[in-house]
Amino acid sequence: AVGGVLALLGGAFLHDWPQAALWHVVFAAGAMPMIFAAMTYFTPVLTRTPDAPRALVAIPLAALLAALGIVAWFAHGIAAFRHIAPGLGVAAALVFLHWIGRRWRACLGRPHACLRWYATALACLVLGLTAVGLSAVLPANAGPLRAFHLHVNTLGFIGLTAIGTLQVLLPTVLGQPDPAASRRLARDLPLSVAGTLAIAIGAAWWWPLTVPGAIAYAWPLGRLLADTTRAFGSRPWRPRQASPLLVAAIGGLTLVLTHGLLHAAGSANARNA
């Protein structure tokens, strides 16, 4: 939210800033630390373990510093940040993955299936940041690597986190269990991951790969919407509660997926990624 406000202010008052800098304020400085913070809260719930230690707040802060570093590169051309920022982001993600792994092992019984979505989303972030780091030392491949970075982060890191969290939050908000959620999360993760990687690789190097990728990614979204309607009926759409926004997030992900497919085919613009 803060990132979005800063981006709007930047667009209004900092006309010399490139669009890439402003969008990285929104997604890197805004969304990335927020997702780390959300995972920090939900991981103990999903593993039935104690609250996260206070020291773990350093991870979202490190992610924010990495994001501000890449914004500084785009806005002011500070070359050192182009190399340092992706590495700092990768380090933050790997440390966080290690913490999730420790909580996983400490869990009595099996952790909630959503935890696998979080771990996979973080792995996608590592891939995306590694790609953008490589683009600095492999300038001939910078375009494809940036395209891979864009799609593996939006559909992988942000998308997988959103899909997993949505299936935990919606029953909580409605006060009604969804007995199919755990089975659906376990069954749909391979399809969503395959779709993410196919779209990212296709957008970077061979666009026809994005078509089966989009189908693989969209199938779990359609199944989630159908199961939600079957389990809860019209209740999620009732006003004065958070559930309409949660269900609408499925539509938002579908729009992102559609734009990703068009971008990979060369019909949509993402020059400022």
How would you describe each model-predicted region?
Residues 1-273:
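Hydrophobic alpha-helical transmembrane segments of multi-pass integral membrane proteins
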